[in-house]
Amino acid sequence: MAKAWNVPGLLQDATFRDAAGRVVVTRWREMMSFRDGTLAGEDIEQLHAMRVSSRRLRAAMDAFAGAFPGKSFRTHLRVIKEITDTLGAARDLDVAVDGLEAVVRDFADIERPGIEALVAEYRTHRAAEATHIAALFTRLDEAHFGQRFERWVARHTGVDPGGLQTQPEDH
């Protein structure tokens, strides 16, 4: 699992709003850093890391809900939940396929065709989920959601996202 990014400039005496801005933007960027790998679909761990990061973002938003107006907060949180849920549906299928492939050799020859058919069905569903993920991110891109999200955070917390040098911990 991907390690959570450090939050740049988060000081012990930070105001609630300053901390909210820094943490939420960092978690957003952390999640989005896995986007290309998730869309490529070549490594299921990219999707897993993106989903874990989306859950971190949701937790951060819940923790800092008081820094944002209720109606716009709910609107933005709903989009983040949609991302998490969409990724979760694909992740569940990845886990199921991995699990079945790991044990299929342990079954009697007579049982294997049924398991292999189930794996094939899950792969078909997983391909459909990949299409849903791509469509979701296309829609978010067309709506400029990422830029709007960061501006919304800045407007309500005073934190300038452009000044945050967010990156994975190993950099």
Residue ranges of predicted features:
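Cationic, histidine-enriched alpha-helical/coil surfaces that engage anionic ligands
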Residues: M1-H171
